[in-house]
């Protein structure tokens, strides 16, 4: 597929063949597939399929080099990995080949829980059950209270948002009933109006809060296990300035809870203090408030990305300064 194709249009084209993309950002209506590969990492589908850089998702790239005499390259999966999540720093992607999945008639299920411990525990049980999920989002009530009206009444409770295969709905209902949580089965996911559960998840959660108050921002992190210990310690210190939003993911094949907490902006120092606090509690923070690829990722230089930039963009003209390990 050409990299400028909107993911919305690509999904429609795949539907004709009974297929679907494995991973979507919450911005899938306006995002291009090339932009997602270059700057995305995961999203809807990560509870099944992990992250974009996991082997098996990106099968190949067509790339134009930024040289005095540009070359058109066809990169197989192994070579293409260096350009995956590199923010366009080491080659101009013109087309790509991705793995897809069999299409599933995902069912939207909302579960409300009276306390946070129950909500987190239920998410873990759902994610570890023998059911197919495409989304498992967990939101504290302070977020639910600020979601758009079409998302349903807030009820003052913490909420799970689930996309479940049809044969798994009864299992989710049974698990929820066992902890006295309230279940609403909304039916098959319809993505025509922009008001489905996926539009409440991942980065759209932050976008909805920013519609209320632009001082809300966010962080990204992988929580240490057991997750509640870390979350409770941070909540005690930061209070209402930190509101938890969790997404179930597969990390190297294992079920984990990633966190995209919304954070009230109190200045750069306060944000850095919070990041330091999270790290002290054992969380691995992927800081979205920094310039470089390395700073927002694992914090180390990726030698393969740098080597690809030297091959494809020796003068450093593509997205200059973004790849911290490169010097022309």
Predicted regions and their residues:
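Short cationic amphipathic helices and targeting signals
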Residues: 1, 107-112, 152-174, 217-222, ...
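Extended, alpha-helix-rich binding/interface surfaces that flank or overlap catalytic cores
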Residues: 4
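FAD-binding subdomain of flavoenzyme oxidoreductases
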Residues: 7-8, 12-132, 136
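Short, conserved charged micro-motifs
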Residues: 9, 116-122, 168-175, 226-233, ...
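Conserved glycine-rich FAD pyrophosphate-binding loop
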Residues: 28, 181-328
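Conserved alpha/beta core surface patches that mediate binding of polyanionic ligands
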Residues: 74-83, 90, 132-147, 186-193, ...
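Short, flexible, solvent-exposed loop/turn segments with mixed acidic/basic and small polar residues
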Residues: 94-103, 142-156, 204-212, 246-253
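A conserved active-site cap/scaffold subdomain adjacent to cofactor or substrate pockets
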Residues: 113, 127-186
């Amino acid at each position: 597929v050409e990299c400028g194709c909107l993911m919305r249009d690509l999904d429609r084209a795949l539907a004709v063949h009974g297929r679907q993309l494995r991973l979507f950002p919450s911005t899938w209506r306006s995002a291009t597939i090339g932009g997602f590969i270059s700057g995305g990492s995961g999203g809807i589908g990560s509870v099944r399929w992990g992250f974009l850089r996991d082997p098996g998702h990106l099968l190949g790239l067509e790339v134009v080099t930024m040289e005095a005499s540009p070359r058109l390259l066809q990169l197989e999966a192994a070579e293409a990995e260096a350009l995956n999540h590199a923010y366009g720093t080491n080659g101009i992607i013109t087309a790509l080949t991705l793995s897809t999945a069999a299409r599933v008639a995902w069912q939207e299920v909302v579960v409300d829980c009276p306390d946070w411990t129950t909500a987190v525990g239920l998410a873990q049980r759902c994610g570890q059950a023998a059911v197919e999920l495409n989304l498992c989002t967990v939101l504290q009530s302070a977020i639910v209270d600020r979601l758009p009206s079409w998302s349903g009444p807030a009820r003052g409770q913490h909420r799970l948002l689930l996309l479940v295969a049809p044969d798994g709905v009864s299992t989710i209902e049974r698990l929820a009933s066992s902890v006295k949580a309230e279940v609403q089965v909304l039916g098959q996911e319809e993505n025509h109006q922009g008001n489905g559960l996926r539009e409440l998840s991942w980065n759209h959660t932050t976008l909805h809060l920013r519609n209320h108050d632009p001082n809300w921002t966010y962080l990204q992190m992988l929580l240490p296990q057991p997750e509640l210990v870390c979350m409770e310690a941070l909540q005690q210190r930061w209070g209402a300035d930190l509101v938890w939003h969790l997404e179930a993911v597969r990390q190297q094949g294992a079920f984990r809870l990633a966190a995209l907490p919304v954070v009230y902006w109190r200045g750069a120092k306060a944000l850095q203090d919070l990041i330091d606090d999270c790290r002290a509690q054992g969380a691995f923070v992927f800081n979205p408030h920094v310039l470089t690829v390395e700073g927002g990722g694992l914090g180390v230089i990726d030698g393969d990305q740098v080597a690809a930039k030297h091959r494809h963009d020796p003068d450093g003209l593509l997205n200059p300064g973004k790849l911290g390990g490169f010097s022309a």
